[in-house]
Amino acid sequence: MDLPEIQADWLTPPDLATAARVQRDLAGRVVPHGPDGPVRTVAGVDVSQFGRDPSGRVFAAVVLLDAATREVLEVGTAMRVAPIPYVPGFLGFREVPALLAAFGALSRRPDLVLVDGHGTSHPRGLGIAAHLGVLLDIPAIGVAKSILVGAPAGELGGTRGSRVPLVWQGRTIATVLRSKDRVAPLYVSTGHRIDEEAAVDWTLRLGGRYRLPEPTRRAHEAANAFRRAWGTGAAEGSGV
């Protein structure tokens, strides 16, 4: 798919102060409603890295599925060197450059993207799902496995579909969602061009057998496989 032109400091800011300002600015561009059109294809995205890799290589995968059948239609992969070290709250600047390259390897644009990470449930309102969604101007959902900020507003039931709000500074920033009976919950938030109710609905609709929805589960597997293949010299994808 064709990628938009992106302002340089939206991806590689010179320092964390600039990065924080960029996050606040881009958070103001998040559209918290939608999607506006039919969703026929969905993409899951995730990244993988070698443990203690001083080079900072990020291996990204985007897996495109048919929304109705969950058939895998395409897989895009790319490796990039992260422009900044890992700093909590600034994950997008490490991972989004590689993910954009992986999106560029696809032949078509997804109708909806599920991201392994936070959307607007972030100190400055721009987790990786919101960062990616705004840059691509594509409906995006953050499906995180842990809390970055906030606390559940109530006790979560043990059955699939149980949910409570995740609240921070007096406002709801995500939904704590039980995606499978008696497993740890997910933290689902708007990324861009989708409302919270639709984000939860799609997360459940695309899940079932596992804790993770199928798109991000497949992307997790694809990113790990790409990293392992790179280590053996057998990887195919977009390099540096």
Curated annotation (Swiss-Prot):
UniProt: Mg(2+) binding residues: 46, 116
Annotated EC: 3.1.21.7
Catalytic activity: Endonucleolytic cleavage at apurinic or apyrimidinic sites to products with a 5'-phosphate
Principal location class: cytoplasm
InterPro entries the UniProt entry points to: Endonuclease-V
Site feature location: Interaction with target DNA: 86
Keyword field: Cytoplasm, DNA damage, DNA repair, Endonuclease, Hydrolase, Magnesium, Metal-binding, Nuclease
Names of required cofactors: Mg(2+)
CDD domains: Endonuclease_V (cd06559)
Compartment annotation: Cytoplasm
GO biological process assignments: DNA repair
Similarity-based family: Belongs to the endonuclease V family.
Protein name: Endonuclease V
Source organism per UniProt: Rhodospirillum centenum (strain ATCC 51521 / SW)
